[in-house]
Swiss-Prot record:
Cysteines joined through disulfide linkages: C52-C162
Similarity remark: Belongs to the alpha/beta interferon family.
Record's protein name: Interferon epsilon
Knockout or disruption consequences: Mutant females are substantially more susceptible to (and less able to clear) an ascending infection in the reproductive tract than wild-type animals.
Record GO terms (molecular function): cytokine activity; cytokine receptor binding
Organism, as annotated: Mus musculus (Mouse)
Amino acid sequence: MVHRQLPETVLLLLVSSTIFSLEPKRIPFQLWMNRESLQLLKPLPSSSVQQCLAHRKNFLLPQQPVSPHQYQEGQVLAVVHEILQQIFTLLQTHGTMGIWEENHIEKVLAALHRQLEYVESLGGLNAAQKSGGSSAQNLRLQIKAYFRRIHDYLENQRYSSCAWIIVQTEIHRCMFFVFRFTTWLSRQDPDP
């Protein structure tokens, strides 16, 4: 099935190429939107999506404060970390109940764990998490609430295949949110 391999491949290719490009000295990110990743981000087969249209839900991904320009670099890293952590927790908690095989989920979790460790190793993350401005802290709380709604949705839908297809789409949306922040980070001037 297409949707069994898509999340792992998207997470591995897109997140790895973007997040692993981060360096403490802010070396520009690799070009993450390459031809292969664009192919992988094609929509699910229309038959799968059409079958699940009745299950759609707006999880209210925070859209208003998504401009990274209003945050400092450490705060942006904290937001990226929060999103990756929430995706990791979602898949770790509920992934084996979904449409993917257990070994497949383990690979995705391992990749996400590496990403999280790398982001945590970057300077500025811990300080930003402790001191973060109110707008960055507010965004992190909105992200947590967003993922809580996803958790609740899966539970209410009893982890059905359609619910997982909807959640898979949401994970893709989250990754684009991450890329918006990481693209901004890559454009910052390197330290002298």
